[in-house]
A protein has these predicted regions:
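N-terminal post-signal-peptidase region of extra-cytosolic proteins
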Residues: 59-61, 89-96, 122-126
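Sequence contexts marking disulfide-bonded cysteines in secreted/extracellular proteins
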Residues: 11, 93-95, 196-198
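Acidic/histidine-rich, surface-exposed loop or edge segments in extracytoplasmic proteins
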Residues: 51-61, 114-123
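C-terminal motif of bacterial Sec signal peptides marking the signal peptidase cleavage site
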Residues: 6-9
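A cross-family detector of function-defining hotspots
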Residues: 71-110, 136-181, 185-188, 203-204
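Glycine-centered tight-turn and secondary-structure capping sites
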Residues: 69, 127, 131-135
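Extracellular mucin-like PTS domains
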Residues: 21-49
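Sec-dependent N-terminal signal peptides
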Residues: 1-2
């Protein structure tokens, strides 16, 4: 009887050890599976527009990334250039600013928004290739019936009119009788005058 008891005790002990071993293995596997994988944060890059240059085209919408209707601050961001403002000029309902290190281009601001872009630098051109120095005939040849010619203040204005008659945007080529001396992109009525602020009623 003593021998039987001893065998029983040995057998029981072996069973307990076998039952506990898988439990430890499962716990270890579970521990491995619940370990989160390392995470990689996405990299973000900020792309700034290139500075405004003569490679940017003048259109009925603006000049390069500078759009009609922008504030001066928005134009600085879009052009990649600071704007030079005379002291106290922002208190006026109409004033003119220039982009730093970009002579020959100015922006007329009416009631806080850019309404006219005045280009006198012959390096700039429209998206169709029109530029300062061209004759009136060359401008007419480029745009055909879209050009409306008007005598204005001792010169002539060759105005490009969009096909949509309700569109107030224009590009105006001012000629001294021989060749184009200025190109303006803007909205009527401001763009139709050599002095946009006078057209806006400032100083009257």
């Amino acid at each position: 009887m003593a021998a039987v008891a001893t065998l029983a005790a040995c057998g029981g002990g072996g069973g307990d050890d076998a039952d506990s071993a898988p439990s430890s293995t499962v716990e270890a596997v579970a521990s491995v599976e619940t370990t989160p994988p390392p995470t990689t944060l996405p990299t973000t890059t900020t792309t700034e527009p290139p500075p405004l240059t003569v490679d940017d085209a003048l259109t009925t919408g603006g000049l390069g990334e500078v759009r009609l209707g922008m504030t001066v601050g928005e134009a600085e961001v879009a052009s990649g250039r600071l704007m030079d403002l005379p002291p106290g000029v922002e208190e006026s309902p109409c004033y003119e600013v220039t982009a730093r290190d970009l002579p020959g281009v100015s922006f007329v601001v009416v009631d806080g928004r850019i309404r006219v872009i005045d280009v006198r630098d012959p390096g700039f051109a429209t998206s169709s290739g029109a530029r300062i120095g061209m004759s009136a005939d060359e401008i007419r040849a480029l745009f055909g019936e879209r050009i409306d010619e008007t005598p204005i203040e001792g010169s002539s204005a060759l105005t490009f009119v969009p096909s949509d008659a309700n569109d107030p945007a224009r590009v105006v080529f001012f000629s001294d009788g021989t060749s184009v001396t200025r190109m303006l992109s803007g909205t009527v009525p401001h763009v139709l005058s050599l002095d946009a602020c006078a057209e806006a009623g400032v100083g009257e």
